[in-house]
Amino acid sequence: MGKIYISQLFPEERVNKILNKYDIGLEIIEFGIGYTLDKDDNGIVEYYKRNGELIKNRSLSIHGPFLDLNTASFDNMIKQATLTRYNQAYSVAKRLGADRIVFHSCYYDDVYFKDVYINNSLEFWNEFLIDKDESINIHIENMYDKDLLVLKELVDKINSNIISICLDIGHANCYSNQSLEEIIKLLGSRIGHLHLNNNDGKKDSHRGFNSGNIDVIETLELIDKYCNNPSMTIEVSDFKEAEESISIIMKRNNK
């Protein structure tokens, strides 16, 4: 497996405890909300004041903005707002020295025909990537995607070596019509990053590895078999369950 990150889903003092205990990276979610990016210096100065020591010499991932945005929108003003926010978040990632940034797929199959979604999204991503170098990996994450074939086709058409898929296994468990095994076999080496958590298949509750109906270890074995060493973020909202999940990953990796 590749690099391991913990998502900053609980108070900073608890994140600090985990990062002091384990040699892992941090996925920052603070810049995923638009009003943070509206602050002076896109919120970086304020974040550094609180967390400068926490992130020093640490692998970082940024969760990009997602609320009210849409890469596939027919409305040019919405697409431009999305482009602005994505560029702001990318700039934050660059200045913090992040390894990667994660953006949602924005696919709603009850709204968009597949071909329309792919064409609109492709236009957006081609514009976004014009001035991006290879220093940051960009991952497109499944959210409400029912059929992951659509995301596969989009990534293939973008055809960039810095673009890959972030497979969120919790989202897939709740919203996809396909099993995780089918999805992993379908996407294969296109999976560059993982969001790992568990749920009951009904609500995206971000539970720990042992608190849901996903067999996380079996899923990771499929990842080992069909993918190319993706990085992963443990995206669990409960502190104790997050610690337990990290321990499970560490024990598995040390076998």
What are these model-predicted stretches?
Residues 2-8, 24-28, 60-63, 101-103, ...:
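Hydrophobic faces of well-ordered beta-strands that scaffold small-molecule active sites
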Residues 1-64, 68-88, 255:
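N-terminal pre-domain/capping segments
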Residues 2, 16-18, 148-156, 160-164, ...:
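Histidine-acidic metal/acid-base catalytic patches
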Residues 72-164:
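Active-site acidic/histidine proton-transfer and metal-coordination neighborhood
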Residues 7-11, 29-33, 65-67, 106-108, ...:
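Active-site beta-loop-alpha junctions enriched in small/polar residues
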Residues 15-23, 41-62, 88-96, 129-133, ...:
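Acidic (Asp/Glu)-rich catalytic clusters
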Residues 35-36, 68-73, 108-113, 174-175, ...:
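A short acidic, helix-capping loop that chelates divalent metal ions and anchors anionic groups
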Residues 41-47, 78-86, 115-125, 177-186, ...:
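Charged helix-capping and loop-helix junction motifs
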